Amino acid sequence: HIDPQPELQDPYQRLLSVIEGNPEQVLNKLIDLGQSSQVFTNHWQVAQRQTAKLLTQYQAPFSEFSAMQEILKKVPKDIQIHLSNSMPVRYANFLGIAPSKTRVWANRGTSGIDGSNGTAVGHALSSDQLSLLLTGDLSFLYDRNAFFHNEDLSHMRIVVFNNFGGGIFDLIPGPEALDPAEKDKFLTTPHQKDLSHSALDLGFDYEKCINSSELNAI
């Protein structure tokens, strides 16, 4: 951890070492140390190319994953993307985003999903670039007040992957050991909210896609 302050907060007790100093200056010093071995980088790039090739052969019914794959293939180069918790950032990390002028942002709130909309709005308001928020239904619904203002968001687009609850808890290890009723009540929190009502209330145009053809038509 690099920080100009000698006294640091470490609530998770996970810091192994602390470098006291200005982060930018310290990192510039590391650059001056010279070129390190490229062996690891080369292996990583080979694996990345192999994975990218496999992903082009991916065939499955329309799903959140395939939708994310299509979206990332078609986003403009000069754009900033904000990834919310929990599945959107995992999908994007797995699929990868092609190197370009794209700026990628993400944040994790205390409970994971909280604050994603607000952070994305802040990035949109601080830039003239087209901004794209890729988020889940719970993340979007949890932080709707982030759009309750009179600022211009005409250059912002929002894609909500709506699986009507916390779909992440069906994929990660641990929650399957819970009683199903407890899991639904405290983790998955299933719902039947119609997000078109939120879009209308917030003054956004709304499109719903339930297959690849509808997604590609937008």
Which sequence ranges carry the predicted segments?
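Phosphate- and divalent-cation-binding pockets in alpha/beta enzyme and binding domains
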Residues: 10, 29, 70, 90-92, ...
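Generic structural signal for well-ordered, non-membrane alpha-helical segments
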Residues: 23, 37-44, 48, 60-68, ...
